[in-house]
């Protein structure tokens, strides 16, 4: 049986727990101050049907959380490549896409920039809405947002490239 992500459940989770600054985050998970973005999208996908396993997991025990749960590049690598070892059908959980016309709610966006502040892939967010006026909107931790338009940050807001991680 293939792993299936319920996109609506992923968005419901994001809508419920997006505002980390007000303390509205799921207390069943650790919170990584100043660097919680990939932890947040991992929680969204876990709630929506992607099971935790020894290669993609989170823990309150220091050092026990996998990098694939919390680190931008490691999340992308796990979901689009090495997760195939953890699925019954041998396929990765997700695929990488580069075209914004091929995405929908529940997909993950990762931001890239080469600047003094960032050097490479540095931020993960989840698509929370496709708006008829603003287009792709996202929810995020670290810089908390619920329905922020992608157009606010890309291509003219400091983000120079985006990639999309989309469940199969």
Question: Where would I find each of the regions flagged by the language model?
Answer:
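N-terminal capping segments
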Residues: 1-70
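Residue-level marker of positions within ordered structural domains that often coincide
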Residues: 19, 45-46, 114, 130, ...
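Glycine-rich, aromatic-bearing surface loops/beta-hairpins
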Residues: 123-168
């Amino acid at each position: 049986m293939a792993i299936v992500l319920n996109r609506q459940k992923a968005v419901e989770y994001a809508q419920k727990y997006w505002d980390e600054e007000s303390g509205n985050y799921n207390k069943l998970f650790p919170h990584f101050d100043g660097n919680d973005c990939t932890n947040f999208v991992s929680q969204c996908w876990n709630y929506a049907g992607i099971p935790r396993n020894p290669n993609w997991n989170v823990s309150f025990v220091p050092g026990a959380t996998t990098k694939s749960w919390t680190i931008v590049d490691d999340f992308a690598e796990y979901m689009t490549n090495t997760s195939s070892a953890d699925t019954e059908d041998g396929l990765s959980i997700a695929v990488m896409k580069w075209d914004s016309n091929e995405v929908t709610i529940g997909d993950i966006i990762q931001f890239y920039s080469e600047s003094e502040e960032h050097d490479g892939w540095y931020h993960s967010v989840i698509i929370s809405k496709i708006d008829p006026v603003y287009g792709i909107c996202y929810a995020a931790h670290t810089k908390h947002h619920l329905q922020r338009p992608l157009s606010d940050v890309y291509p003219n807001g400091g983000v120079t490239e985006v990639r999309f991680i989309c469940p199969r």
